[in-house]
Amino acid sequence: MGELTEFQKKRLENIKRNNDLLKKLNLNNVSSQIKREAGVEDEHLDRKRKKKAGSAKKAVKKEPKPAAIPTRRSRRLRGENVDGNGIPNVNDNQLLKMGQSDSTPELEAIDELKNTALSGDVKLSDLIKSENEEELLDKFKSFANKNFSSGDFFKELQQQQVPTPEIKQLQEDFDLKLYDIFQPNEIKLTAERISATFFHPSVDKKLVICGDTAGNVGLWNVRETQPEDELEEPDITKVKLFTKNVGRIDTYATDSSRLLAASYDGYLRSINLQDMNSEEILVLKNEYDDPLGISDFQFNYNDPNVLFMTTLSGEFTTFDVRTKPTEINLKRLSDKKIGSFSINPKRPYEIATGSLDRTLKIWDTRKIVNKPEWSQYEDFASHEIVATYDSRLSVSAVSYSPMDETLVCNGYDDTIRLFDVSGTLPEDLQPKLTLKHNCQTGRWTSILKARFKLNMDVFAIANMKRAIDIYTSSGVQLAHLPTATVPAVISWHPTQNWVVGGNSSGKAFLFT
């Protein structure tokens, strides 16, 4: 036999290393034990028995063939509990860690530290190894002094229809172009799937903030001119502030130099763009002191210091951001997750909620119902229901138009529904218009949510056919902005015709 090649030597080393690891884990004995418990005999023993039987004298009576049995039956399928001696259900990295018993305590300590929520007030420069504190402050100071108060076949249909002059003008206004100074695959704001986006209200310079499913927050200082250096990268600052999904990002209604971000880990934190400090505003907990994931929040139109919030378990509460958190008064609006809510700008005491319980409900927050009949929870008060729409599948998003009293919702039934909410509402709410739309996501794409622009009766929603679609409140499509991937989580600039969408790999598509 000739000399082994380098590839063959490497392969033998891998086989030896894997065998050593399997010996440490004692998997051979475990495998034999599972076979015995499942009633499966070893194939080698079967062959030996057959050979021995063949060499003996002819049998007088032919034995019937045994009934076929499954080659393997797991304990889970047999309804048995795992006793700790079975083959561990782990991935390759975890398997290697198990084989390195001397380093397990340290690895466990690191994993525990990664899952520990960030508590108290912090400097972002302390969390970002690659950033100098002075450079970090200079980068965002320009955003700290701004005052701000609170269709897949589009082209084909456009050619067949004769729009009104008003619609034609809107279509021209929203014929937006994709930002091209950097390619979208270079604009990576977060490490994981984007779950929240926000367009800062500054007009002189653009700032886009995104949060992801791992609790990371990325701030993109958008460059307006071509860089002199071809190797220059987008100006993105990344920091990990939470341990779970970032559910919502906004600015304070009274101070746009302060950002506010909420997470599924129950934390509400601010980011001051002037000094780049992050302050812990609130940790939302239930009566058992367990964190309540914050799914959505919005500042009240009547009082810009009061925050309305909803939770992953169906509660609703209000909080004055000027005060220190004390006892939180929770009201139950659903027995399941509230994924989205919106405050009616014409009647700020009314809110609409979209829930996993397949309903859109409108509530009067001035009125309390101590024992709601619809809830299975006896100890929770609620608010009074004004109107309800029952959907075939869960309702993902709700959003009020700023001026003409239209409410939009979308969900997993691949529709966008528009409701007229002016005047007195019937208990059984029915849409004025239903649009078919490709908006049902899978597990790898964030939920698509229709969002009205703050200063116009125009809303946008991502399309699973890789685009952002823009509509009027009467359902007329104004634009179909194609993208390379699904820009699932969108955000409008509050005053300009700019929109941004974030995808499942942490990247952003900006249209201006």
From Swiss-Prot:
Residue spans of the WD repeats: 189-230, 241-281, 289-329, 333-373, 390-429, 442-481, 482-512
Can you quote a single GO CC term? nucleus
Family annotation (Gene3D superfamilies): YVTN repeat-like/Quinoprotein amine dehydrogenase
UniProt keyword Zinc, yes or no:
no
GO MF annotation, one: DNA binding
Asked if the keyword Metal-binding belongs to this entry, the reply reads no
Instruction: Give the GO biological process terms.
Output: DNA damage response; regulation of DNA damage checkpoint
Which intervals carry biased composition (Basic residues)? 47-60
Using the UniProt annotation, give all residue ranges assigned to the region (Disordered): 32-96
Ordered alphabetically, the record's keywords are: DNA damage, DNA-binding, Repeat, WD repeat
The annotated regions of Basic and acidic residues compositional bias extend over 34-46
SMART domains, alphabetically? WD40 (SM00320)
The portions of this protein that span the membrane are none
Under PROSITE patterns, the record lists: WD_REPEATS_1 (PS00678), WD_REPEATS_2 (PS50082)
InterPro entries noted in UniProt: WD40/YVTN_repeat-like_dom_sf, WD40_repeat_CS, WD40_repeat_dom_sf, WD40_rpt, WD_repeat_DNA-damage-binding
Q: Which PANTHER family match?
A: WD REPEAT-CONTAINING PROTEIN 76
User: Which family does the similarity line name?
Assistant: Belongs to the WD repeat DDB2/WDR76 family.
Say what the protein does. Answer: DNA-binding protein that binds to both single- and double-stranded DNA. Binds preferentially to UV-damaged DNA. May be involved in DNA-metabolic processes.
Please give the name of this protein.
DNA damage-binding protein CMR1
Q: What is the lineage of its organism?
A: Eukaryota, Fungi, Dikarya, Ascomycota, Saccharomycotina
